[in-house]
């Protein structure tokens, strides 16, 4: 079984990818989606969202990272995929739509998720310059997964994708449970490439596996709220200390960055002191503020700590 870290825009940046992959259990991760409109993007845009490209497209823990593209112009997608391949990207992830409103609002996934003739050249041309192309997609906005979607997936496979990541939810359904895992089983039967179940959390994972027959998963919010979830699933070995260490590294990074609460940067929030690894990490994610905008915390024998610890 393989476990991937979901590319949640505005949350999973290079810092969280580094921290989560250090805990262990994650086989590969994906960047936040790079929006492709009508032109070839500058290299700086790729470096901004994928700074790991300077280190061989791997996190500091050595976890491979894929580059995700979002757009509706197959030719422009192919052009940017070729540039990413020149920069050394090991795989291109084509986002054909996910339940996130920012992904489906502008029709970025429209032609790719509903038109067989459109998604084929897009995926094939993107797969050409790179070693392989991965498809991360959802069903057509507002349409139940039953209606013709396995045919679209077959078209993607014919275009050269190496695996498919399926949300099993529509735009209207969003992230509300339950997901249509029975249609994930139909997709798995229709294609000859690995299929991943894109899950919000690790809860009821066995139910998803039993219904769909899919072993591989992509985890999002569940990994952010519990950093050792992938490790626990893969090795059946919960490790709260790893989560606590990740939170401490996050706090030290915040202290060295000099950010202040309210600046719009998630990174400006330090770690709340606690004896529980999960409480530590959740305090980080919930953006617990400092006592004042100019508070720099305090230095103790154990290192930097926030003022209230």
Swiss-Prot record:
The record marks 35, 95, 175, 267, 286 as: Interacts with tRNA. Its EC number is 1.3.1.-. The active site is at residue 98. FMN binds at residues 7-9, 68, 137, 198, 220-221. It comes from the Bacteria. Its cofactor is FMN. The keyword Oxidoreductase applies. GO terms for molecular function: flavin adenine dinucleotide binding; FMN binding; tRNA binding; tRNA-dihydrouridine16 synthase activity. It catalyses: 5,6-dihydrouridine(16) in tRNA + NADP(+) = uridine(16) in tRNA + NADPH + H(+); 5,6-dihydrouridine(16) in tRNA + NAD(+) = uridine(16) in tRNA + NADH + H(+). SUPFAM superfamilies: FMN-linked oxidoreductases. Keywords: Flavoprotein, FMN, NADP, Oxidoreductase, RNA-binding, tRNA processing, tRNA-binding. The keyword Plastid does not apply. This is tRNA-dihydrouridine(16) synthase.
């Amino acid at each position: 079984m393989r476990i991937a870290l979901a590319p949640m825009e505005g949350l999973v940046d290079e810092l969280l990818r580094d921290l989560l992959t250090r805990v262990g259990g994650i086989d590969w991760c994906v960047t936040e989606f790079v929006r492709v409109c009508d032109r070839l993007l500058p290299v700086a845009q790729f470096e901004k969202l994928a700074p790991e490209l300077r280190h061989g497209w791997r996190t500091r823990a050595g976890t491979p990272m894929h580059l995700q593209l979002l757009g509706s112009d197959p030719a422009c997608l192919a052009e940017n995929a070729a540039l990413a391949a020149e920069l050394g990207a090991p795989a291109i992830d084509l986002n054909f739509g996910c339940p996130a409103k920012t992904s489906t609002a502008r029709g970025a996934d429209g032609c790719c998720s509903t038109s067989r003739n459109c998604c084929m050249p897009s995926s094939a041309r993107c797969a050409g310059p790179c070693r392989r192309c991965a498809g991360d997609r959802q069903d057509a906005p507002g349409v139940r997964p039953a209606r013709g979607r396995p045919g679209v997936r077959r078209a993607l496979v014919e275009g050269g994708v190496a695996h498919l990541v399926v949300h099993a939810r529509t735009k209207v359904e969003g992230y509300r449970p339950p997901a249509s895992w029975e249609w994930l089983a139909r997709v798995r039967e229709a294609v000859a490439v690995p299929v991943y179940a894109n899950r919000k959390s690790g809860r009821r994972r066995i139910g998803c596996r039993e219904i769909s027959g899919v072993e591989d998963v992509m985890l999002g919010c569940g990994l952010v709220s519990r950093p050792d979830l992938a490790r626990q699933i893969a090795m059946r070995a919960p490790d709260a200390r790893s989560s606590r260490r990740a939170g401490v590294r996050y706090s030290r990074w915040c202290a060295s960055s000099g950010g202040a609460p309210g600046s719009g940067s998630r990174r400006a929030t330090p770690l709340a002191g606690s004896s529980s690894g999960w409480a530590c990490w959740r305090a980080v994610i919930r953006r617990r503020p400092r006592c004042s905008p100019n508070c720099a915390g305090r230095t103790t024998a154990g290192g930097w700590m926030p003022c209230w610890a």
